[in-house]
Amino acid sequence: MKRTVSIISIFLLCFSLSAQDSLSIKSQIDALQKQYDVNFVYDPGIIQGIDSKEITLSGKNIKKDLSAVFSGTGIDWELRKNFVVLSKEYEQELSSNIDTLEAARITTDKLRRTNRTQTGLNHLDASKLLSGYAVMSTPDIVKVLQTMPGVASGSELMSGLYVHGGTGSDNLYLLDGVPLYQVSHLAGLFSSFNSDIVESVDFYKSGFPARYGGRLSSVVDVNTKAGDFNEYHGSFSIGLIDGRFNIGGPIVKGKTSFNLSLRRSWLDVVTVPTFAIINAVNRKYGEKTWFGYSLWDVNGSITHKFSEDNVLRLNLYNGQDRMKLSNKSLPTDDDPSTDISSVKVNWGNSLASLDWNWRFDDKMSMRSMLYYTRYNGKMAYGYEDRSNDTKVFSGDKEESGNISRVQDIGLKTDFWWMPAEKHLVRFGASVQPHFYRAERYAEYSRYVDGNEIPDSTASNGAKYYGTEFSSYIEDEMKLTGWMSLNAGLRYSAYQTGRKVYHSLEPRAALTFSVHPSVDIRASYSEMSQFNHQVSSVYMDLPTNLWMPSTESVRPMRSRQVAAGVYARLPENMSLSVEGYWKTMSGLIEYVGKSTLFPPIDSWESQFTSGKGRTWGVEIQYQWVTAVDNLDFSYTLSWSQRNFEKIWNGWYADRFDNRHKINVSYTRKFTKRFDAYIAWCWHSGNRMTVADYMVDTRHVFTMGDKPVKVEMEGFAVSEIPFYTRPNNVKIPDYHRMDLGCNWHRVTKRGNESIWNLSIYNVYCRMNPFYAVVGRNGMYSSEIKARAYGLVPIIPSFSYTLKF
């Protein structure tokens, strides 16, 4: 099969171009480069075999000189600022161009990461996501981001993202510009982003542009693919615990297209025979257990082009988790009753948006969006006691649970204005009404002769409303040939009840090009967050609540300075060293009794406000070719907290991982086979353990009588004493992952891929939780023992593209 292929290598630096090209035309390119201070971008093969021409360069008009050099050669040129991009069309077997095209794409992506103004920005495209980290053979965006320097992952296999000492709930997740509140499936095993439909991800850790706001620590901006306007494309994947399907194409050719992507797990199907066997074995013990779990994601979009400059797009998304666990004690001759206990957990996101993009002219364009987004979480417990076909539980059936819901309606408009070639101004505004609901309930009903009679319902809940308004202006310009600036200002206001909070957030990022291949960048940014995730545990569970800032709980705020050196090295290598310092205020921490459900009534009184600080250095090295991809990163960081009601002074954060190393290597051995290996290690998380127990009868007295000490309503004779919070570091975390892909072409010309992945190759049982107890029956010393839960996990998947 022959096709016309245009080979363009974008942003390839002149100092790394091959010296084995045709000397005649190469010398003319060098002369133009020196004369006009431009960089030529091209594939070395396109100038081979071209005869030299005797010409005289004018030195006054670059366009005339370019036309003189390349006229009659078949080479097309395009002037892009201070780059000249060369391309050439020719017919050749497509298979022989795969590596060249891949090299051009990889080089472009590598230089995109280093040729920008912002610090702390990582750009990922679809190919990077699909070729990287895959647990259960399912590529996952958040799992890839967890491997980035400056990011802590929290508990193993969870979707935690603790960026630069953040809290985990201070990351702004955007799906096509719409915020998501919950991005975890299966308790964090997967994220809510289906990689089949993802086009690109921009991940900001510092140097935030003024157009982003509402969270403290990071921005994860996920953009999905629009459907093809001329042809139908799709894919089908089946894995160990889930399946995926994607299809897109024209509705009206050249005018309207669609893209639909589905993902669903079949754990609920797989567990049916498993628990059938378990129940057959346990029947003699009079017990029956049932477990069902399912998750799904549905992404859809319809795009209509009124013209090339006027595009309207409708985006829809729904992602849900459903879990039920029940245990049933069967009747016996001695006890004819049947006890049933159950747990139900549901959570998920839904969103809809209408996105209008209008390009007025070459200098002005606009994007306006109306959207709705909702998060809903529910956990419920139930218990029944059946006797002689009549259900009785002290005359009642009981179900109690917890509900958390957040709904946003938003309208935002952004403008792009380019007053000059190297000058871009962005500005816009948005308004977001927020609706929060938190509820704890208990329902009782009586069964008489098999009929359910509602008895009573008890509930306590809270509803909050808040309106967030923001506006910004952002100016990006190239001040000189060696200095670029991105400066902006964001204003936000939040009304909750009779209280209005105002926030002015300056942003600035500056780049100095000290060498054609070396940049020095620095940035300063301030961020505000008006909503809080209320949790009484250190895990992202459906029981957690979202609450707004109130008159007594102020918004959170962060200030961050970052600076670094970024080098583009020969042989497709890059190296960056970046440091940061960040402070946070308005953080909240739970100080109430230990419980799974966070408080709802007067929740502000059971949380205390404090501050945080974090600093560190990140080193990242990359080597990327058409067949090899090596990525190494190291992070040295400190993360501390200061809550006066918890401790008088600074102490280490729970996820204060001092050192972190990530190494990954991908190799394309042939066109049909590639493999990857990854290894990660970081210092262990921290936990609070009492240093010793003190007998209070010999310590506290009032006059001649000992004081009676009570903890949670029980009189005790001893209490724990701590040196400081998070005083113990659990063992370090490390593991290795392997994976490989087999590619083949089916008889119909479609690509199929077999993937085999192994998570935790050497079965390191990394600490997941710890048990605290005495170091001996009569000892006052305390010891803690960590336990691991996640062993080696092999998995596979099959993908067919059409």
Model-inferred region functions:
Residues 269-270, 672, 681-716, 731-735, ...:
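C-terminal beta-signal and adjacent terminal beta-strands/loops
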Residues 322, 376, 442, 516-561, ...:
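Surface-exposed extracellular loop regions of Gram-negative outer-membrane beta-barrel proteins
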Residues 116-169, 177-195, 200-208, 225:
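Periplasmic N-terminal accessory/gating domains of Gram-negative outer-membrane beta-barrel systems
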Residues 29, 33-36, 73, 83-131, ...:
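Short, acidic, small-residue-rich periplasmic hinge/interaction motif at the N-terminus
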